[in-house]
Amino acid sequence: MEIYLVTGNMNKKEEFLKMMDEELNVEFVNINLEEIQAQDIVEINEHKVKTAYNILKKQDNNKNKKRYVITDDTGLFISKLNNFPGPYIKWMQKALGSKGIADVVSRLDDNTCHAICTYSVYDGKDVHSFKGITNGKIVEPRGNNKFGWDNIFQPESLSKTFGEMTFDEKQNLSPRFKAFVQLKEFLMNEHKKYNNEF
C-alpha cells in the first residue's frame, strides 16, 4: 500500500509530517494540476485527486499496485461577500495580499467568515473526502504569514490570529487539522485491511 500526498508546498508537507503517524509511509509528489472552476471545494478537490492519480498511474510500471493519492484544497468564505472568495482565495491573496483582503473586509459591516479545508483520497475506485471547518473573522494582519491568510484569520471567540499561534495552539482549531483527523483514521483503517490481506 503506497500513499502519495500531492503538494509542492513545503509548509503543507512539514505540517502533514508533524500530524501523520509514523506507521504510515507517505511519499510527497509535486504535480502541477489544473483546477476546475467551481464554488464547491469538495468538487474541485475530487477532480484534482482523480487527475493526480491518473498521472501517477501512467508514470508507474506497476499498474496493479494499491495506491492512495491525496490532494487538499482550502477556501476562505467571507459572509458579507456571499462566501467569496471561497476556493478562489489563493488568487485573491495573490492579487491583494493579506492586508488588501483585510482592507476590503474592514469596509463591510460584518467581518465574519469560515475557513474550509478538504482532503480527498482516491484509490482508483472510490474517492473519499474529509472536510474541516473553522468559524472566525477577518482582522488586520497580525503574526506570521506562513500559510497564506493565517495572519488575518482569527478563530471565533479567540483574540489571536492563526499567524500568532504556535503549531500546537493552531492544530486543534485549524480546518486542515480537523479534516486531517478524519483522513488519518480512514488511512489507518485501510492500512489494517491491506495488512490483513497479506
Swiss-Prot record:
The coenzyme or cofactor needed here is: Mg(2+); Mn(2+)
Quote a single Gene Ontology cellular component term. cytoplasm
Query: Gene3D superfamilies per the record?
Result: 3.90.950.10
Cofactor remark from the record: Binds 1 divalent metal cation per subunit; can use either Mg(2+) or Mn(2+).
Q: Which residues bind ITP?
A: 7-12, 48, 73-74, 90, 147-150, 170, 175-176
Signal sequence region: none
Subcellular location, principal:
cytoplasm
Give UniProt keywords alphabetically. Cytoplasm, Hydrolase, Magnesium, Manganese, Metal-binding, Nucleotide metabolism, Nucleotide-binding
- Tell me the GO BP annotations in alphabetical order: deoxyribonucleoside triphosphate catabolic process; nucleoside triphosphate catabolic process; nucleotide metabolic process
Q: Where does Mg(2+) bind?
A: 35
Q: By its UniProt entry, which InterPro entries does this protein fall under?
A: ITPase, ITPase-like_fam, RdgB/HAM1
E.C. number(s) listed in UniProt: 3.6.1.66
Q: Which domain of life is it from?
A: Eukaryota
Q: Name one GO molecular function term.
A: dITP diphosphatase activity
- Cell location: Cytoplasm
Q: Which reaction does it catalyse?
A: ITP + H2O = IMP + diphosphate + H(+); dITP + H2O = dIMP + diphosphate + H(+); XTP + H2O = XMP + diphosphate + H(+)
The answer, when asked if Nucleotide-binding is one of the entry's keywords, is yes
Question: Which residues are listed as membrane-spanning?
Answer: none
Which PANTHER family has this protein been placed in? Answer: INOSINE TRIPHOSPHATE PYROPHOSPHATASE, INOSINE TRIPHOSPHATE PYROPHOSPHATASE/HAM1 PROTEIN
**So what does this one do?**
Pyrophosphatase that hydrolyzes non-canonical purine nucleotides such as inosine triphosphate (ITP), deoxyinosine triphosphate (dITP) or xanthosine 5'-triphosphate (XTP) to their respective monophosphate derivatives. The enzyme does not distinguish between the deoxy- and ribose forms. Probably excludes non-canonical purines from RNA and DNA precursor pools, thus preventing their incorporation into RNA and DNA and avoiding chromosomal lesions.
The UniProt similarity line reads: Belongs to the HAM1 NTPase family.
Subunit structure, per the record? Homodimer.
The protein here is known as Inosine triphosphate pyrophosphatase
Species = Plasmodium falciparum (isolate 3D7)
